[in-house]
Regions:
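Conserved, structured core segments of small domains
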Residues: 1-96
């Protein structure tokens, strides 16, 4: 089975409140077998504007597991913190 990857592009709008998301989300990711590959490190954008200075990449064992995590009851309240304190997008892609 192919791995699933979450690619998040974010601009934090309220850093103080966003810290709660940063504290809570790793446990939920781990519960679904996810692991961080990149979490807000240095990056360069080509062929577009850099509107989202925070890039996060998470690998899950399968594409289905990534979707299960994103739609889970455990992630729902944590996701609400992120949505209230940042702008951006999450993309879930199936690996090769």
């Amino acid at each position: 089975m192919a791995a699933g990857y979450v690619i998040a592009q974010l601009k934090v709008t309220n850093l103080e409140n966003y810290k709660e998301y940063v504290e809570k989300v790793p446990d939920v990711i781990k519960k679904y077998g996810g692991e961080y590959l990149a979490r807000g490190g240095e990056h360069q954008v080509f062929e577009a504007e850099d509107n989202f200075p925070r890039i996060v990449i998470i690998k899950f064992p399968t594409y289905e597991k990534a979707l299960e995590w994103y739609h889970s009851d455990e992630y729902k309240p944590v996701k609400a913190i992120r949505l209230s304190n940042s702008e951006g997008s999450n993309i879930i892609v199936k690996g090769l």
